[in-house]
Amino acid sequence: GVWSQYLEVGIGPDAEIFTKSQAMSAVGSGFDVGLHPGSSWNNPEPEIVLVINSKGHVVGAAMGNDVNLRDFEGRSALLLGKAKDNNASCAIGPFIRLFDDHYTIDNVRTTDLSMAVHGPEGFVMQGSSSLSQISRDPLPLMTHDPSTLAWQLTLLNPFMQKRPLMDVGSKQWDFEQLEIF
């Protein structure tokens, strides 16, 4: 009997597209990821980032970590912008792989993502997913706004129900190791 706006994501006639990665939100591999000081429940979202040139053509892909502020988003879907667009909240890298004869969008379509979070006191959370399970093909989505530099495709969205994965009282994630493979 409980309804959530997320129950219908990916099945309606309209693609759920929102902007991400304002100029100050993207950071490279190895840099600190930013968290909003008012958030106490946030988690990583490993994603595939599509790189698009100025003509709107997808030219490559990279790994991405789209940090999500669960407590903000959970209060209201209207806070999605605040939950997503924060300084340094979108880590990209460690490299961009350009498409060529051996690596194409078809490879991206079948990419499997796995993630493991190793935290204090032996806490471990693991998850995996395949982009082959995503509800929409990425290429038609790229025509929505060809001026965009990078798009992220999310399927793996790890979180523990009603329990913050990471406490950021010190503005640092409370885990020892994050692996995306």
Give the predicted meaning of each segment.
Residues 107-149:
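Active-site neighborhoods and metal-handling regions in enzymes and metal-associated proteins
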Residues 1-119, 127:
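Active-site microenvironments in enzyme catalytic cores
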